[in-house]
Amino acid sequence: MSLNQLKAPRGANRAKKRVGRGQGSGLGKTAGRGGKGQKARSGNMHFEGFEGGQMPLQRRLPKFGFHNIFRRELEEVKVGDLQGLSGVVDPAALKSAGLVRGNRDGVVVLAGGELSSALTVKVHRVTAGARATIEKAGGKVELIPAPQTMHQKAKAAKKAAAQAK
């Protein structure tokens, strides 16, 4: 077999849709655009949410809320998910166990499920119910400081540069 003998499999290349070429094609006269109206014209500009000139819903409703750029997004782990682990449980151990991805601003342990083994849990945040469950099983909870956000790192670098002068 050589390059000049290569051929696309049957049905791989669809024929170009030829519109407006007679009734027999099924796409004659209006070319599949239906009757008259804005959508039948060329360059039919209308944006998503356009209501024919009526004030659209997204503009009729008032704005509310905001997105806090300093918000910390924590990865959640339930106490019951820690059941298979042993010894010291920290974010690195949780990542290797596949319980967290490790791409957020820290880890929070939530109540939910049972725990039978004593664990030392080192996380960024823990709920009261989760702490009670861990300590009831004979374990202990240690809070570790949250990793710095990009904003905090930039601020610290700026402060260090100012003090170095």
Swiss-Prot record:
Coiled coil start-end: none
Recorded hits in Pfam families, A to Z, give: Ribosomal_L27A
Name the keywords, alphabetized: Ribonucleoprotein, Ribosomal protein, RNA-binding, rRNA-binding
Task: Please provide one cellular component term from the Gene Ontology annotations of this protein.
Answer: cytosolic large ribosomal subunit
Please note every region of biased composition (Gly residues): 21-37
One GO BP: translation
Query: Which InterPro entries does this one have?
Result: Ribosomal_uL15 (IPR030878), Ribosomal_uL15/eL18 (IPR021131), Ribosomal_uL15/eL18_sf (IPR036227), Ribosomal_uL15_bac-type (IPR005749)
Q: Which GO terms describe its molecular function?
A: rRNA binding; structural constituent of ribosome
Which parts of the sequence are annotated with region: Disordered? 1-44
Checking PANTHER family in the record gives: 50S RIBOSOMAL PROTEIN L15 (PTHR12934), LARGE RIBOSOMAL SUBUNIT PROTEIN UL15M (PTHR12934:SF11)
Assembly and binders: Part of the 50S ribosomal subunit.
By sequence similarity, the record places it as follows: Belongs to the universal ribosomal protein uL15 family.
Q: What does this protein do?
A: Binds to the 23S rRNA.
Instruction: Specify the protein name.
Output: Large ribosomal subunit protein uL15
- Organism annotation: Anaeromyxobacter sp. (strain K)
Q: What is the lineage of its organism?
A: Bacteria, Pseudomonadati, Myxococcota, Myxococcia, Myxococcales
